[in-house]
């Protein structure tokens, strides 16, 4: 696939008949796999699909608050979404140019114009047609997820059209087309066991089509109740965009005869395939050490967006740039990591945002659910950048000893040292520490010691400020208490040669700082071409088996078969459990609330897990009964009033735990119909709700963690606005520009 990508990029200079030859058409079809890359190249993708979720907050306050200055037809979100589509782009990047190529391939094969093997080998032609149908379906699906009803071209063009009469096709019509195309693809794509993984890795398979179909059938069932006039939907499935509830009506996808059964059927085709299996260790899915790409061959992965090694000619201009938008900062000489290191994330100058409090709180039992530790950098060890070159990746080197003259870390104060020696040292046996006493004026951190770590606690479990300051590393906690005062995400600050906490300020909410909370591990790229570079060669998982299980679980639950749903849910949760012999992060074993339930041995270096936590992770129906402690811990929105409501929200919680900072979660949340409710009740910066959160004492002129929402979110923000530049381009069938009333009718409600 990589070599073909290179050849395809030369297509614009070829004669148009070339794409009816065997070689030309094959290159054209390979090029349509760019559909999977569109959202991974620039800021548009992560900014579009990480704004509008409930477990992540945009770092720019106006965007995170859903300010009308950003959410309008001329604002950033309209322009980002428009750039992903590419219908009036200056380049050939974007979904519409890809659909154009898909349509060309589809018509060439269907009309019998394709030559060579396409004309003589019916099976080969059907497989190739299926790939083009699959990639067109993916492109249309993502755009419909952004906008609802969209223009879907059926032909292709090699020149400017005579008009821009881009009529929006109803969502029921779109889903009927997608399902029909993907059912054809399912029948004609090869099974993964038949695929040449060395030559065709990354190409669509029968399993990918089945997973996609399961998702589409479930989404159609999820939105069936919105297909009425109350939500602006007419008998043909078209939506009146002047209706205030049209943000729900636009989710309506029609009604099949047995959509839930179809979801179960196609999900089962993947689950029972025999090839696909859950990775035994969740962390292995994202573990990407130096010169090790083995995680990309996991049998849990059904479809990935593939890249070659960094610098490959077939990676496009920058390759996968998600590390640049999701990475976390950590370089600080004062805690023993003086510069960016190869084995830690790259410099993230364009980070789009942060997991919010709800996103961390979803991991209810962090000592049992390994996904918290394996999804986030919860602690860092002191380190120096390895190697002698800025462009040759190398393993991190040990930082200086605590008593080395080159050590530049914070020093112990007398108060810190006294508390540490009396209350912490007697039970602190980290190997690198070697039992040393804290001495005022000596450096805190040295070789192999922790540099800094995070505690994601609650106001009720706030850590005392003396204990926090006396840790043998810099502790960054969500809640710290000082007597009767409670501080929310209080930032540390230098104080002489040591540090303290600045109780006159706060982090989080509208003041997210670069180290205020744990960053994701899912996009770390130690094999980058420069130690601060943004280009990556990592593959990006799009369909994986854990999601397939949860799709089927929701379908079972909606049919009332909770026992079958629980079996599928527990497959995913059992995998997530810490197993005996694994190692917990020190901060989890010593400080994160819940550590006190671990055995004494588990609270000691090397923090090895003694007790398998699988049984602790398994769920039953009490998790959505509305009254039990298990149910309340899931933090369902107040609008989830029935058993089915809570069950569906449990599935969304489980997807959020699995897919944190993976853009796939946006799709699940959006199509569920719960997107607006969950943002309002879960994302404090976005929410206009009052009194849902705890309040703190470290405010700035009355602003900060007051317990109130800080946002202006409106439910119609669940669909993106069409960009004004695109609306101004539209015409009727005669090429006459649309008037303002027609543009208003075309635009989604509220914009």
Task: Give residue ranges: language-model regions.
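Conserved, well-structured interaction surfaces
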Residues: 22, 34-44, 63-147, 162-201, ...
């Amino acid at each position: 696939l990589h070599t073909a990508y290179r050849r395809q990029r030369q297509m614009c200079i070829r004669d148009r008949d070339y794409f009816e030859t065997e070689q030309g058409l094959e290159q054209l079809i390979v090029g349509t796999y760019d559909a999977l890359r569109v959202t991974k190249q620039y800021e548009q993708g992560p900014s579009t699909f990480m704004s509008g979720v409930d477990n992540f907050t945009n770092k720019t306050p106006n965007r995170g608050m859903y300010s009308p200055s950003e959410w309008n037809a001329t604002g950033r979100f309209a322009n980002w979404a428009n750039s992903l589509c590419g219908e009036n782009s200056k380049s050939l990047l974007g979904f519409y140019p890809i659909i154009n190529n898909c349509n060309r391939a589809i018509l060439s094969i269907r009309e019998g114009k394709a030559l060579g093997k396409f004309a003589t080998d019916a099976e080969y032609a059907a497989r190739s047609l299926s790939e083009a149908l699959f990639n067109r379906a993916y492109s249309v699906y993502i755009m419909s997820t952004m906008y609802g009803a969209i223009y879907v071209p059926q032909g292709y063009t090699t020149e400017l059209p005579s008009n821009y009469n881009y009529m929006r096709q109803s969502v029921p019509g779109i889903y009927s087309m997608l399902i029909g195309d993907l059912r054809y693809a399912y029948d004609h794509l090869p099974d993964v066991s038949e695929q040449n993984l060395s030559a065709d890795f990354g190409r669509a398979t029968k399993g990918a089509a089945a997973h996609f179909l399961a998702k589409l059938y479930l989404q159609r069932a999820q939105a069936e109740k919105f297909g009425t006039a109350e939500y602006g939907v007419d008998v043909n499935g078209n939506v009146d965009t002047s209706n205030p509830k049209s943000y729900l009506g636009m989710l309506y996808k029609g009604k099949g005869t047995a959509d839930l059964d179809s979801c179960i059927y196609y999900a089962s085709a993947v689950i029972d395939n025999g090839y696909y299996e859950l990775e035994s260790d969740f962390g292995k899915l994202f573990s990407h050490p130096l010169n090790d790409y083995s995680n990309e061959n996991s049998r849990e992965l059904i479809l990935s967006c593939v890249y070659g090694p960094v610098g490959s000619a077939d990676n496009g201009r920058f390759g996968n740039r998600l590390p640049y938008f999701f990475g976390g900062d950590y370089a600080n000489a004062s805690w023993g990591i003086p510069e960016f290191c190869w084995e830690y994330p790259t410099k993230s100058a364009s980070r789009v945002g942060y997991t919010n409090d709800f996103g961390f709180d979803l991991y209810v039992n962090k000592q049992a659910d390994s996904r918290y530790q394996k999804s986030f950098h919860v602690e860092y060890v002191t380190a120096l950048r390895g190697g002698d070159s800025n462009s040759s990746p190398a393993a991190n080197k040990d930082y200086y000893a605590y008593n080395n003259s080159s050590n530049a870390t914070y020093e112990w104060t007398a108060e810190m040292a006294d508390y540490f020696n009396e209350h912490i040292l007697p039970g602190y046996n980290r190997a690198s520490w070697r039992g040393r006493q804290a001495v005022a004026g000596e450096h805190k951190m040295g070789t192999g010691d922790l540099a800094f770590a995070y505690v994601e606690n609650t106001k009720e479990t706030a850590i005392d400020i003396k204990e926090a300051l006396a840790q043998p590393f810099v502790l960054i906690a969500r809640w710290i208490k000082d007597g009767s005062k409670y501080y929310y995400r209080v930032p540390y600050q230098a104080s002489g040669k040591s540090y303290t906490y600045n109780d006159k300020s706060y982090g989080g909410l509208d003041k997210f700082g670069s180290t205020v909370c744990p960053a994701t591990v899912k996009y770390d790229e130690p094999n980058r071409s420069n130690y601060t570079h943004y280009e990556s060669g990592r593959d990006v998982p799009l369909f994986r088996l854990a999601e397939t299980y949860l799709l089927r679980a929701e379908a079972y639950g909606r049919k009332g078969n909770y026992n079958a749903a629980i079996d599928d849910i527990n497959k995913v949760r059992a995998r997530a459990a810490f197993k005996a012999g694994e190692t917990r992060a020190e901060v989890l074993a010593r400080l994160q609330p819940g550590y006190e339930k671990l055995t004494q041995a588990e609270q000691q270096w090397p923090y090895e897990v003694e007790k398998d936590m699988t049984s602790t992770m398994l769920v039953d129906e009490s998790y959505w009964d509305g009254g039990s402690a298990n149910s309340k811990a899931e933090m369902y929105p107040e609008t989830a009033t029935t058993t089915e409501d809570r069950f569906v929200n449990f599935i969304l919680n489980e997807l959020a735990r699995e897919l944190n900072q993976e853009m796939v979660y946006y799709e699940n949340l959006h199509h569920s119909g719960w997107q607006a409710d969950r943002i309002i009740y879960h994302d404090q910066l976005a929410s206009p709700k009052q009194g849902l959160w705890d309040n703190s004492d470290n405010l700035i002129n009355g602003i900060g963690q007051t317990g109130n929402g800080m946002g202006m979110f409106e439910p119609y923000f669940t669909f993106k606005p069409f960009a004004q530049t695109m609306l101004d381009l539209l015409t009727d069938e005669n090429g006459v520009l649309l008037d303002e009333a027609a543009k208003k009718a075309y635009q989604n409600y509220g914009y």
